[in-house]
Amino acid sequence: MESMEQPLHVVGAILLQGDRILVARRAPHKSAPGLWEFPGGKVEAGESPSEALEREILEEMGLTIKSLKTLDVSDTLVGEREIRLEVIVCELLTDFEGFSSDHDEFLWASKDDLPSLKWATPDLPAVQQLLGFDNLSDLLRYSSDR
C-alpha cells in the first residue's frame, strides 16, 4: 500500500494596520510569480506554526511579529502537492520598511481591495474568511477572544 505524502505545512501572516492588511506579491524568481499572498513560509520540523511564522517574517522581511490566533487552516492541491496553509492573525511589533527577499511589491490592502487581487490559490480560503468581517480591524478583537 502506498503511503500518502503529508501536506506541505506553510504559514501566512495577517499583519494589520488599522483596517488594512499587508499583502505581498510573489517575486519573479519564486513559484507562482506575480500572485498575491499573506507573507510567511514553511513550518520546519520541531517548530510550532507560530514559531515558524515569526522566524520566516523576521528572515524574509526583517520584521518582529507576535502570533495571536489562527484565522484559517485549509488544504489546497497545487500541481501534485498538497499545501496546508495556516493563516495567523499577528501583531506587528516593528515598522515595515518595504523589504522582502521573496516579494517584489506590497500593499496595505483594505477589505474592498482583496477581491480584485490575483491571489495564490492556497490563500483564497483565508481571503474568503476576511471578507466575512465587517471591518478588518475586527480581527484584533477576534484575536483576543481566546
Locate each region found by the language model.
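Short coil/turn segments
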Residues: 26-29, 119
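Short solvent-exposed loop/turn micro-motifs enriched in small/polar/acidic residues
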Residues: 5-8, 69, 99-100
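Conserved N-terminal beta-strand and adjoining loop/helix that marks the start
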Residues: 2-22, 42, 73
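The catalytic Nudix box helix
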Residues: 38-70, 110
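Nudix hydrolase/Nudix homology domain
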Residues: 33, 97-146
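Conserved beta-strand segments that form the floor/walls of ligand-binding pockets within enzyme
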Residues: 22, 37, 87
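Active-site-adjacent beta-strand/loop module that shapes the phosphate/pyrophosphate-binding cleft
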Residues: 8, 74-97, 107, 111
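Short, charged/polar surface micro-motifs in flexible loops or helix N-caps
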Residues: 16-21, 29, 44-45, 91-96
